[in-house]
Amino acid sequence: MRRKIRVTFPKLVQEVLQIDQEYFNLKKETIYNLIIEGLGFQEISSIGADIIDEKRSINFNLNEKNSKLFSEMLKKSGLNELSEAEFLKRIFITYANLHPSIRERILYKDIFLRIEEAIRKKKEINIYYKDKLEKIKPISFERNKENGDYTALRMKIYNKEYLIEMKEIEYVT
């Protein structure tokens, strides 16, 4: 069963979430659940927890997977003294304090892992990109200042090099 969640954090965190939601064209509930899934079992930071700023709250439902794993996340965090709301607040603050390219890796972990493996093995892969399936040879990840420091993929298609935004890749095989 899906759990209803309410989290309050500094306005700065909400601004970062809003920017990423718009950049990646994700629904609010989707991005919130991806963040919890990506950081729930990681070491979270208390950096920024004491920010004195206008507070904002979000309400959303945990997806089925996060609903099942949430109590384990809380236990494994080693922060048992924290309430669920404080634990979630720290997850979102940790996310907001990360570089945009790292935030992107959290949201699209599986795609990054598959492409990284293909780069290491110098192997061609298929990507679903802009409504087309393309056979590519990934070369490297790069930061693109034009897109706000999010990640771009340098790749070859038919021996011609291209640089594409990672957010445009929907699927990797």
How should each PLM-predicted stretch be described?
Residues 94-173:
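Core beta-strand-centered patch of the WYL/Sm-like small regulatory domain
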Residues 10-30, 64-86, 90:
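Surface-exposed, Lys/Arg-rich phosphate-binding patches that contact polyanionic backbones
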Residues 1, 52, 145-147:
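Short, ordered beta-strand-loop transition motifs
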Residues 23-49, 80-105:
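Short, basic amphipathic alpha-helical segments that act as recognition/interaction helices
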Residues 22, 42-75, 97-128:
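Short, positively charged interaction helices/loops
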